């Protein structure tokens, strides 16, 4: 990598497929090989390379924010699950996470999308793989960062309001909500 940076991880196929650690980069880029590393598949093959100076908490909260923002809100497990994942990831990223939050995130992934086909679209299925793999594969790093938190910062974060997915600065727009088409007075 440029500047003598080291690879921390690679998301090989768009954010929904999950993450490979630096130690897993010798896997083949085919569907069967990446599945052995807990990934959903190859997705769009739009690779994202994360270097060693990137805080894993930032990766986690950005992924959670993306999926919470993209949820249309029609399916309960997606609307509630992505919202909860964002709240927990945001708490961790802002320096007030708990070890139990890591377990909560993994539990949420099992409750909202590990059985494909239970929602209108595939968004909850795609949301769980990156969260699950980031937490599981970088757990030691998360635990170390949580252990280094200042108790005062934890109190400050608890007092702050966590923004909803709609208030977050992604494209500066709210997600489109499904609405019933209007009908004319003539019934046409």
Task: Outline where the language-model segments fall.
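Redox cofactor-anchoring modules in respiratory/redox and cofactor-processing assemblies
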Residues: 1-188
